[in-house]
Amino acid sequence: MATFVLVHGAFQGGWVWGRVDEALTELGHRVHRPTLGGCGLHRARPEAALGLGQYAQELVQYLKDEGLINVTLVGHSYAGLVCSLAAAALPEAVVRLVLVDGVLPKPGLCFADIAGEPFGKMLAAHALPGGLVRPWPLESFGVSPEAAAWFQERLGPFPLAAFTEPCPQDFQFSEAKRAFISCIPAKTPLLRLMANRAESEGWDVHALMSGHCAMVSAPLELSGLLH
């Protein structure tokens, strides 16, 4: 039995991992799916000041409060940054780090830096008053038409600072086992770049035929890879 902590990407909440939670639980694992501040049930009132550092610390505190050890920490998309920082901050608790179409941090760079100019333009186009960002177009998430309405009604704004706060200059990955699950075909240059980088840095890389949000479009297949 393993202990999984599943962390959602931008605009979402712990709800997005529901079917993966069910599948892993049936396989005998313990599953946690926390919701980052200002997301999920609290999406109507996100805090604009929340950034990468605060989200990482929030996740570290969650692991401590729950008394979790021997954790497999799974981050999707944006949460690749959050989970990587949390794993580095709490190496005694996190033994395995898995990124699902996740963004790998680089010291001194923020999400927007890593994603490049096209993302910067999209970020500006989706900016809301008060330092928030509205969700990307639905097709960016790669969910099926059957799940589209259910998925979209649960999305909410996300703090701009989360995309613009840089990773600490002294960041280094922990010694935890690392795996990257690439949802193919990758829809953006960023996701292809992340998969290639993970492979070049010696991560265990797995391909999954799925849309970007594999926990919605291919939950059983994703659960099988995590298991």
Annotate each PLM feature.
Residues 74-79, 83:
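Gly/Ala-rich beta-loop-alpha elbow adjacent to hydrolase catalytic centers
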Residues 153-172, 186:
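Active-site nucleophile elbow and catalytic-triad environment of alpha/beta-hydrolase enzymes
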Residues 176-182:
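Catalytic His-Asp charge-relay segment
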Residues 2-43:
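Conserved HGGG/HGGXW glycine-rich cap/lid loop of the alpha/beta-hydrolase fold
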Residues 48, 88-134, 189-190, 195-197:
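Flexible "cap/lid" loop of the alpha/beta hydrolase fold
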Residues 30-32, 36-72, 88, 112-117:
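Active-site loop/oxyanion-hole signature of alpha/beta-hydrolase fold enzymes
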